[in-house]
Swiss-Prot record:
Protein source organism: Nocardioides sp. (strain ATCC BAA-499 / JS614)
Gene behind the chain: rpsS
Lineage: Bacteria, Bacillati, Actinomycetota, Actinomycetes, Propionibacteriales
Designated name of the protein: Small ribosomal subunit protein uS19
Keyword set includes RNA-binding: yes
NCBIfam families (UniProt xref): rpsS_bact
InterPro entries per UniProt: Ribosomal_uS19, Ribosomal_uS19_bac-type, Ribosomal_uS19_CS, Ribosomal_uS19_SF
Amino acid sequence: MPRSLKKGPFVDDHLQKKVDAENAKGSHNVIKTWSRRSMIVPDMIGHTIAVHDGRKHVPVFVTDSMVGHKLGEFAPTRTYRGHVKEDRKGRRR
């Protein structure tokens, strides 16, 4: 079930403070965060946010089409290496 509209979007306070500070300076430095649960708000457009995926920080450049989604959606936590091919050279009939 989606979040109630009267509550508004959830953004961690420490992340919002970092975004506000970057907007006040007018710079677009990379903002490092562990908050995958924070929702992308219009203040973040144009910033690069490094979202933690469990072992490293994945840089995510925020565009206007991402508003309303969560940061964790853009930093996958699982690496898919494909299915292992079966080795038939050693098999005998």
